Regions:
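Function-determining surface determinants
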Residues: 1-214
Length: 214
């Protein structure tokens, strides 16, 4: 069910962000920090997207804290004094406090008390992924905005990275492998240059995901 599936997923993300937090402190290199950024952003997106499984108020608070970490990490990566800024930021007690709080909450049964906690995990993932596909396609076709495009693409890519195999849908596999696997910004120009083909694939994927509607 959603309760068990989501708990396992959050443990996985938490283990990853802690690993790259430690690695960033040890190595002080941008590659480790980019990975740390990826998982902080993943946690923000997942906690804010799937809060129907969780205590809504608490998950929203945690999501905003990971959003703040994401923003600060992006600023450091763009800074000329990135090494010094990185150490000050990652050594901040606020991050350790957040990790301690998060570690506590994901182990607590009361954290998983959302309205949909007893539904099937696969169904909830499919519905959320379909929603992201529809919104992303709408943005490309009707109301293109670069910042919104980048944000909605990343949200879609995050869910595909973790769940495209889990849902066993060929069009999702194709969507991930061809367009969402690389985190390079060049992928945006590839999508725009192949907009019609890409949007057709999004439409097919959305249609495939309807089988989980229930």
């Amino acid at each position: 069910n959603a309760y068990d599936g989501f708990r396992i997923f959050l443990f996985y993300l938490f283990k990853k962000i802690k690993f790259y937090w430690t690695l960033s402190l040890e190595r002080k290199d941008k590659q480790s920090l980019y990975e740390f950024l990826f998982y902080s952003r993943s946690l923000y997106i997942v906690l804010s997207s799937m809060n129907t499984i969780l205590d809504k108020n608490l998950s929203n608070i945690l999501a905003l804290k990971f959003k703040d970490i994401t923003k600060k990490t992006q600023d450091i990566l763009a800074s000329e004094n990135s090494n010094q800024d990185l150490l000050l930021f990652l050594s901040d007690e606020k991050i350790q406090d957040l990790f301690n709080d998060f570690d506590f909450f994901i182990k607590e049964n009361s954290f998983y008390e959302g309205d949909c906690k007893d539904r099937f995990f696969k169904q909830l993932v499919a519905l959320e992924l379909r929603k992201k596909i529809i919104l992303f396609r709408k943005n490309i076709l009707k109301n293109f905005d670069l910042e919104l495009f980048e944000n909605s693409f990343f949200e879609l890519a995050i869910f595909l990275e973790y769940f495209y195999r889990f849902l066993e849908i060929k069009n999702l596999n194709k969507l991930y492998e061809k367009y969402c696997k690389d985190r390079d910004k060049n992928i945006f120009s590839k999508i725009i240059n192949n907009k019609n083909k890409f949007c057709k694939l999004l439409k097919k994927s959305s249609k495939n995901l309807k089988i989980y509607k229930g």
